[in-house]
Design a protein with these regions (language model features):
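Positively charged, hydrophobic/aromatic-enriched amphipathic segments
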Residues: 33, 51-52, 85, 101
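N-terminal helix-cap/turn-to-beta initiation motif at the start of protein domains
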Residues: 28-44
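General structural signal for secondary-structure boundaries
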Residues: 35-37, 48-54, 71-72, 178-179
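Generic short beta-strand segments
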Residues: 46-53, 96, 102
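N-terminal glycine/threonine-rich, aromatic-flanked beta-hairpin/loop signature
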Residues: 58-111
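Sec/Tat-exported extracytoplasmic proteins
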Residues: 42, 49-56, 83
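Calycin-type beta-barrel ligand-binding domains and close structural analogs
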Residues: 5, 10, 14-31, 92-179
Length: 179
């Protein structure tokens, strides 16, 4: 089973951008992390992967290159690898997630909250990975999923990173390069 990843881009979700940027954190005390419900990510989300491929994000990569340590092409390759997925859309309502694949196939399941995992990055920062498990393990929907939206408490995100596996949470490998 391969791990699938996806990120949505700002402006591609159903709801208006409405969170407080002060809640976005990459350094925090572990005890500050709060449990969250799937409803925090409610809405219709679109993968950023096609935009990394088709040139839509090229201006962003160029701007990053002006400030960063890589060229625009290196950033583009880096993000293409991190965003890579065959899922085009994710729809979240209540405890239910429906995944739409490139071929149009749709699969979904209700999910139960398992808890959070604190991911320590090599950069010295960290993230709260909110974990959910499919209730219907035979639906074809990913069984184990983790959300990261750079927040540690309930809030409506402007985007999120999601990692998935049908094997286990431990099978979600290479967190530095697979978002």
């Amino acid at each position: 089973d391969s791990v699938k990843t996806e990120e949505s881009v700002e402006g591609m979700q159903e709801a208006e951008h409405a969170h407080d940027h002060s809640k976005e954190v990459s350094t925090f005390e572990d005890h500050e992390v709060q449990d969250r419900s799937l409803s925090d990510w409610a809405g219709s989300w679109q993968s950023a992967y096609p935009f990394a491929l088709d040139g839509t994000l090229d201006d962003a990569f160029a701007a990053m290159a002006e400030e960063g340590e890589m060229t625009a092409d290196e950033y583009k390759t880096y993000y293409q690898n991190g965003y890579k997925t065959d899922i085009t859309n994710i729809d979240i309502e209540g405890d239910h997630i429906e995944f739409t694949y490139e071929d149009g196939k749709k699969v979904g399941s209700d999910y139960k909250y398992i808890g959070y995992y604190i991911q320590n990055w090599s950069t010295g920062t960290k993230a709260a990975m909110y974990r959910f498990e499919a209730v219907d393990r035979t639906s074809g929907a990913p069984i184990y999923i983790e959300f990261n939206d750079h927040m540690i408490e309930s809030a409506a995100p402007e985007h999120f990173l999601i990692r998935m596996s049908n094997e286990s949470f431990d099978a979600i490998v290479d967190p530095e390069n697979s978002w």
